[in-house]
C-alpha cells in the first residue's frame, strides 16, 4: 500500500540537509512512498527585510505582514529558499518541482486577523489533485508556505501550519516537523510519544514553553484530523517524539 509522508523543513535547510536525509528520501521512494516537502524561510525573510530597511515586528510570535512584507516574503521564499532546496535535491539525483499558492490554486486561504497581523492567513483548501498528478510523475513537490484568498490576495502562513494543513487534506500517514532539537524534552529526556492529554498536562505545568507550543499544537491538530503519526525531530532518520492519539 502506498504511503504518504509530508516533511516540513526550515528555510535554511538547503545548506544543512545531510547525506542521510537524501538517502532516506531515496529509500522511501524505492518503497513507493509519496513525499511532499514544505519549507519555511523565516530567517531569510528577516534578512531580506533588514536589507530593504523594512521593520520587523512579531505579535504573539506571528510576523506582522504588510503588503510590502508579503512581497518581500514571496521574494525570499520563491526567489531564494525554494530554488536552493530544489538544487540541493537535484545534486542528489532527486527529482522535485517547486510549487506555490499560485500553482493552479494549490493553497487557498483566508485572513487570520487582518487588524492584528495584516496579511497572515490560514489554509482552508488544498489542491490535492495537483499533488497526486505530480506524484504519478515520480516528482516530489516542494511547497512554499503561502496561500491565496479567493480574491487573489497572497497570505503569509506559518510553515508548520501549512505542512499540517497539507498533511490533513492529503490524508498523510506521517508528518515530520523538523526542528533544531531531537524531540520534545522533559527534564532533559526526549519523550518517545506524546498524546493530547500528556501535551495539555505539560503545557499547564509550564514544562513545554516557547516555540515548541505552536509546533505541538500543529501536531495535535494533524493527528486529530487523520494523520496517523506526527514526528517532532531534527532529522527524518530518527523518529524523535511521535505525537499520536
UniProtKB/Swiss-Prot annotation:
InterPro entries: AceGlu_kinase-like_sf (IPR036393), AcgluKinase_fam (IPR004662), ArgB (IPR037528), Asp/Glu/Uridylate_kinase (IPR001048). Keywords: Amino-acid biosynthesis, Arginine biosynthesis, ATP-binding, Cytoplasm, Kinase, Nucleotide-binding, Transferase. It is found in: Cytoplasm. It comes from the Bacteria. Its EC number is 2.7.2.8. The record marks 8, 215 as: Transition state stabilizer. The keyword Amino-acid biosynthesis applies. One of its GO terms (cellular component) is cytoplasm. GO terms for molecular function: acetylglutamate kinase activity; ATP binding. The keyword ATP-binding applies. Substrate binds at residues 41-42, 63, 156. It catalyses: N-acetyl-L-glutamate + ATP = N-acetyl-L-glutamyl 5-phosphate + ADP. Pathway: Amino-acid biosynthesis; L-arginine biosynthesis; N(2)-acetyl-L-ornithine from L-glutamate: step 2/4. It is an enzyme of class 2 (transferase). Catalyzes the ATP-dependent phosphorylation of N-acetyl-L-glutamate. Belongs to the acetylglutamate kinase family. ArgB subfamily. PANTHER family: N-ACETYLGLUTAMATE SYNTHASE, N-ACETYLGLUTAMATE SYNTHASE, MITOCHONDRIAL. This is Acetylglutamate kinase. The gene is argB.
Amino acid at each position: 500500500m502506498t504511503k504518504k509522508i509530508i516533511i516540513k523543513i526550515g528555510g535554511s535547510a538547503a545548506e544543512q540537509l545531510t547525506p542521510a536525509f537524501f538517502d532516506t528520501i531515496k529509500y522511501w521512494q524505492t518503497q513507493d512512498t509519496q513525499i511532499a516537502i514544505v519549507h519555511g524561510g523565516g530567517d531569510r525573510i528577516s534578512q531580506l527585510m533588514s536589507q530593504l530597511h523594512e521593520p520587523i515586528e512579531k505579535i504573539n510570535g506571528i510576523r506582522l505582514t504588510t503588503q510590502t512584507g508579503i512581497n518581500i516574503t514571496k521574494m525570499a521564499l520563491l526567489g531564494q529558499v525554494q530554488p536552493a532546496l530544489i538544487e540541493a535535491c537535484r545534486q542528489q539525483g532527486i527529482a522535485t518541482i517547486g510549487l506555490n499558492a499560485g500553482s493552479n490554486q494549490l493553497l487557498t486561504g483566508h485572513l487570520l486577523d487582518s487588524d492584528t497581523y495584516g496579511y497572515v492567513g490560514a489554509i482552508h483548501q488544498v489542491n490535492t489533485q495537483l499533488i497526486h498528478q505530480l506524484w504519478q510523475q515520480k516528482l516530489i513537490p516542494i511547497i512554499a508556505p503561502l496561500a491565496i484568498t479567493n480574491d487573489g490576495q497572497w497570505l503569509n502562513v506559518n510553515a508548520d501550519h501549512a505542512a499540517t494543513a497539507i498533511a490533513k487534506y492529503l490524508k498523510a500517514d506521517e508528518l515530520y516537523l523538523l526542528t533544531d532539537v531531537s524531540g520534545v524534552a522533559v527534564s532533559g529526556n526526549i519523550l518517545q510519544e506524546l498524546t493530547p492529554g500528556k501535551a495539555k498536562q505539560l503545557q499547564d505545568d509550564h514544562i513545554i514553553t516557547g516555540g515548541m507550543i505552536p509546533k505541538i499544537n500543529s501536531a495535535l491538530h494533524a493527528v486529530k484530523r487523520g494523520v496517523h503519526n506526527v514526528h517532532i525531530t531534527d532529522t527524518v532518520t530518527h523518529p524523535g517524539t511521535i505525537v499520536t492519539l
